[in-house]
């Protein structure tokens, strides 16, 4: 059993509402400057997140299960052993619709090709971001969605 004094409260919130909220012993994510892991009593931090996977190691009562969440930007704020991730969008691995993610990937690839042909850098950047989001969702679902 996890020491109740060493538990974090982890929440992931999007403009659509709460996507995830559980007690945990660790949360790891990709910040814009690299991988970050937060455990009990970590110093307070606010940092922007990159498109990537968030891993939450649940408490021993949950057999140390690790939950995986696809996060598309945002930031994490941690203080007083509460981690709140405010994300542009986020989905738990088990909730990701593979067909939708594959369609988004295909659309992004088409937009990239069109932007390349038009030599439009802004559209190319937007398409690259959309592609990274779709690939992230597919990766999280295919590797961790049960």
From Swiss-Prot:
Keyword Transport set for record: yes
Protein name: ATP synthase epsilon chain
GO MF: ATP binding; proton-transporting ATP synthase activity, rotational mechanism
SUPFAM superfamilies documented for this protein: Epsilon subunit of F1F0-ATP synthase C-terminal domain (SSF46604), Epsilon subunit of F1F0-ATP synthase N-terminal domain (SSF51344)
Keywords (A to Z) from UniProt: ATP synthesis, Cell membrane, CF(1), Hydrogen ion transport, Ion transport, Membrane, Transport
UniProt topology in membrane: Peripheral membrane protein
Family: Belongs to the ATPase epsilon chain family.
Organism placement in taxonomy: Bacteria, Bacillati, Bacillota, Bacilli, Lactobacillales
């Amino acid at each position: 059993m996890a020491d109740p004094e060493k538990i974090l409260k982890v929440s992931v919130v999007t403009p659509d509402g709460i996507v995830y909220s559980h007690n945990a012993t660790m949360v790891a994510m990709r910040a814009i400057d690299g991988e970050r892991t937060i455990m009990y009593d970590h110093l307070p931090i606010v940092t922007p997140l990159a498109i990537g996977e968030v891993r939450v190691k649940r408490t021993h009562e949950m057999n140390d299960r690790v939950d995986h969440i696809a996060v598309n930007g945002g930031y994490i704020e941690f203080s007083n052993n509460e981690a709140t991730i405010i994300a542009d969008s986020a989905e738990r691995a088990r909730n990701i619709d593979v067909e939708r993610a594959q369609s988004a990937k295909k659309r992004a690839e088409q937009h990239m090709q069109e932007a390349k042909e038009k030599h439009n850098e802004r559209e190319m950047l937007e398409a690259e971001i959309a592609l990274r989001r779709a690939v992230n969702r597919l990766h999280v679902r295919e590797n961790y969605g049960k």
